[in-house]
Amino acid sequence: MTMASDDQKPARAGFCMSGITDFADGISAIDTHHIRPASDASYLLIREGRAAFVDTGTALAVPHLLAALQEKQLTVESVDWIFLTHIHLDHAGGAGALLKHLPNARVLVHPKGAPHLVDPTKLIQATIGVYGEAFFAATYGKILPIPADRLQVTEEGLSFFWVDRSYQCLHTPGHALHHYVLWDPIARVVFAGDNFGVSYRELDVNGHAFVIPATTPTHFDPSEMHRTIDRIVALQPAAVCLTHYGQVTEINRLAEDLHRGVDAYVAIAGRHGAGPDRVRRMGDELFEWMSAQLDAHGDRADAKTRHAALDLDIDLNVQGLIYWADRVAASKLSGT
Ligand SMILES: [Zn+2]
């Protein structure tokens, strides 16, 4: 695994009432209020009066994003970009609705994601397949298509200049085939989407983050996820911005935790991936594994509190592991 010197200290900014958390270098996390507070973030980047969003949350997040612009005394005309790290609808679902308010903004997306933003029908159906119709209706809002002429696709390694500095996009499969990360080499910050795990601030112990991999359906691939984690570490970032949730430091320790987590998930899937009642058994074992990690992390919360924080992720991770296990089994059967 790629290693770099780990001299970063945990640094955390305070959350303010509006759900905006300010970090260094004109970066703010905006709580999109998806599912529960501090669960799903959009990032607002501000450079010399110009603005960009990294991910948007769902369509229901749009009022929060517009309010954040207002709070920062920015106009809707000042937004140049919406960077979508990937097109899962808890991060890209609001882009079409937000774009209607932003006359000058364009959307940067992975080439595999672009067609599904122009016509989101399949994306909506797939998301309903994962979460169920009632949950989707209550938590995602109306997903609007994005006009093709406002989309730009990012090639692997694309560097581009915005306002006062260069940024780079790296294609990073593992969580999703349509995923890229955005790298700001001056701030030394990676916007990692879901590629550097999920880490909720309610599970911090003494300012130290707890992180677990996100193996959401349907593209989870463990070897690609290991590679992507290493690729992020190799950049030697001072901080990584996660969609779930906020900015984390101590990158090398978290990367090691993520590598171990991916291996643990795969072992659990291997034990239960083809058996009857596998969803329940994999879910139970994932919770036990996470609980043991939390104990070692110094967390003292009871099982009920841990279930409240982790159950949705466990459900998604199990579904993603099953997709992966079935894909591996099918490829063995067909000899590919
Ligand atoms: Zn995702």
Feature-to-residue mapping (PLM):
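C-terminal regulatory/interaction regions
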Residues: 267-336
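Metallo-beta-lactamase
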Residues: 58-60, 117-171, 177-241, 245-249
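Conserved beta-strand hairpin/beta-sheet module of binuclear metal-dependent hydrolase folds
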Residues: 17-72, 182-194, 198
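Intrinsically disordered, low-complexity segments enriched in serine/proline and basic residues
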Residues: 5, 10-15
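Internal alpha/beta domain cores that form substrate/cofactor-binding pockets in large enzymes
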Residues: 218-235, 240, 248-283
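Active-site metal-binding motif and surrounding structural segment of the metallo-beta-lactamase
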Residues: 63-109
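Short histidine/acidic/glycine/proline-rich micro-motifs that form metal-
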Residues: 112-116, 247
